[in-house]
Structure formats: C-alpha cells, structure tokens
UniProtKB/Swiss-Prot annotation:
Expressed in liver, kidney, brain, and pancreatic islets. The modification N6-(2-hydroxyisobutyryl)lysine is found at K127. The record marks H170 as: Important for catalytic activity. It comes from Mus musculus (Mouse). Residues 1-12 form a transit peptide. This is Hydroxyacyl-coenzyme A dehydrogenase, mitochondrial. Disruption phenotype: Deficient mice display reduced levels of plasma glucose, elevated plasma insulin levels, increased plasma 3-hydroxybutyrylcarnitine and increased urinary 3-hydroxyglutarate. Islets isolated from knockout mice have increased amino acid-stimulated insulin secretion and higher sensitivity to leucine-stimulated insulin secretion. Increased body weight, reduced litter, smaller testes size and weight but does not affect the epididymis. Belongs to the 3-hydroxyacyl-CoA dehydrogenase family. Pfam families: 3HCDH (PF00725), 3HCDH_N (PF02737). GO terms for biological process: cell differentiation; fatty acid beta-oxidation; negative regulation of insulin secretion; positive regulation of cold-induced thermogenesis; regulation of insulin secretion; response to activity; response to insulin; response to xenobiotic stimulus. NAD(+) binds at G34, G35, G36, L37, M38, G39, D57, E122, K127, S149, N173, K305.
Length: 314
C-alpha cells in the first residue's frame, strides 16, 4: 500500500510540475521600446541569445544611432571573447545583428510579440500613455514589462487591462556586462507571468532576483539612501568627499566611493529618484532632498557626462 501511495504521489507531483511548466510562456519574440542606452543594451543581450528582437523608437535617426552603438559593443565583446578565433567573432556579431530589427511604429509590431520591455524616459504619464495604446494592439498572451528604476510598477500597469501580465524588469547599466535583473511582481502579477520572466532572464545569461513593488526595489532602495547619506556627511562638514570615497573603498571594499558613483550614474538621475520617493513619503528622513546635489543639478553639473559634478573631469 505504501509503495502504491508513493507512486501515486510521485505521479501527481510530476503531472503538477509538467502542468505548471506548460502554463509558462516561452519568450522568443521581444519588442524593446526605447533606443537609449538601456533599451539598446536590453535589445543587444536579447538578440545575442537568439531571441527575435524589434527595437522601437520615435525616429529612424535615433534607431540608426542605437544600432550602430549595438554593433560597436558587439565587436568589442567579440574581440575579447574570440581572441583566438576572429572569424567566430565576426559570425557572432553577424548572427546577433540578424536577430535585430528596428521600427518607429510600436503598434504594428506588438501584435506578434511575446514580451514588450519599455525603457523610455522616467515619466509616469508617458509610460501610461504608451502602454494604454499598446494594450489595444498586443496579443492576448503578450507580457508587458517596464525597466523603470524609480516608479512603482502598479501605477504603470494600471493603464492597461493586463495587470496580471505586467511586471517590472529592472536591468542595470551597462546591460551587456551587468548580470543582475530585478523581477518586480505586483499584487496583480500572475505566477505564470513571473515565472516566464524569470526563465527569460536566465536565457539572457542574467541572474534574476525577485522583489515586491516597493519604491526602489532592492538595489536602489539600499543604494540611494547610502549615497545621499554620504552627501549629508559632507554637507555637515564631517569629512571631505575625497576622504569619504577613500574610506568606503578601503574600509568597506567598495569599488567606487559614493561621490565617484554619483558622478558616474548622473546627479540628475539620483535626484529624480530621490524626488519621486520624497513626493510619495515626504516625512521619511531617508528621502529628504540634498541642497548641495540640487545646486549642482541646477547648474547642469551632472557628473562625468557633463565634465563636472562633485568632481571635475577633463
């Protein structure tokens, strides 16, 4: 009797696992909205892993620039990866680019896609308008995902009729190099959608981690308050920015100090995230604005990209 019971339970378990696996969507066709640094990076890694990818932006000029950047990135990767076999490197670049196409008409391509990844400017109104429009044209099974780093996924998903097929996919810059992807599950995101996205991230060679739809998710929720506290330490005159950076590199083992990292990321980017959180939770001491950072942003001193931030760059 015990043997029969074990066999029955094993059979039920196998059937259940097979059924659950069958429910997941195998993502083969990906549409990336936004040809900027993040969107182009996401498109590149998806194409490099054999997915059919369409990169969408407003103009052909933007897309041409994006595709050129992707090609240059692939050539650099091929040179490092295929040092002993340049021909294999050329084939890798050619094969990846053959999986990638571009379009200025998102509505015309989403009807046949498995996944839409949005990587446009961090503006809730624009994201809502985009997804509300795409929702009318996308296939029933299509999953929507936002690469937002600061907005809540629920507030973006509410513009659609597919909240159960909506989640966050937060990649990190530079996308081809950074292994981490935060998969954000809202209260409405189905388990099928979540598992499909986790599997997709793994096919990209990434390491997915899961987080609820909380401000900043995991990395930014820990990182931004740390960066701002370093700025406050400097604002109070407790230590110089140089000594703070040195202390965190030599004492905590961080590869970059907080001021170096702020300049690398862009002061405007960090300010945008902090301002959004402060608006949501004005009494939270972690989210209070930084006068010195606000002053630098007002002067357009945004970090390395403008030649000056907390430090000056030649």
């Amino acid at each position: 009797m015990a043997f029969v019971t074990r066999q029955f339970l094993r059979s039920m378990s196998s059937s259940s696992s097979a059924s659950a696996a069958a429910k997941k969507i195998l993502i083969k066709h990906v549409t990336v909205i936004g040809g900027g640094l993040m969107g182009a990076g996401i498109a590149q890694v998806a194409a490099a892993t054999g997915h059919t990818v369409v990169l969408v932006d407003q103009t052909e000029d933007i897309l041409a620039k994006s595709k050129k950047g992707i090609e240059e990135s692939l050539k650099r990767m091929a040179k490092k990866k295929f040092t002993e076999n340049p021909k294999a490197g050329d084939e890798f670049v050619e094969k990846t680019l053959s999986c990638l196409s571009t379009s200025t008409d998102a509505a015309s391509v989403v009807h046949s896609t498995d996944l839409v990844v949005e990587a446009i400017v961090e503006n809730l109104k624009l994201k809502n308008e985009l997804f509300q429009r795409l929702d009318k044209f996308a296939a029933e099974h299509t999953i929507f995902a936002s690469n937002t780093s600061s907005l809540q996924i629920t507030n973006i998903a509410n513009a659609t009729t597919r909240q159960d097929r909506f989640a966050g996919l937060h990649f990190f810059n530079p996308v081809p190099m950074m292994k981490l992807v935060e998969v954000i599950k809202t209260p409405m995101t189905s388990q099928k959608t979540f598992e499909s996205l986790v599997d997709f991230c793994k096919t990209l060679g990434k390491h997915p981690v899961s987080c609820k739809d909380t401000p900043g998710f995991i990395v930014n929720r820990l990182l931004v308050p740390y960066l701002i506290e370093a700025v406050r330490l400097h604002e109070r005159g407790d230590a110089s920015k140089e000594d703070i950076d040195t202390a965190m590199k030599l004492g905590a083992g961080y590869p970059m100090g907080p001021f170096e990292l702020l300049d690398y990321v862009g002061l405007d980017t960090t300010k945008f995230i902090l301002d959004g959180w402060h608006e949501m939770e004005p009494e939270n001491p972690l989210f209070q604005p930084s006068p010195s950072m606000n002053n630098l942003v007002a002067q357009k001193k945004l970090g390395k990209k403008t030649g000056e931030g907390f430090y000056k760059y030649k």
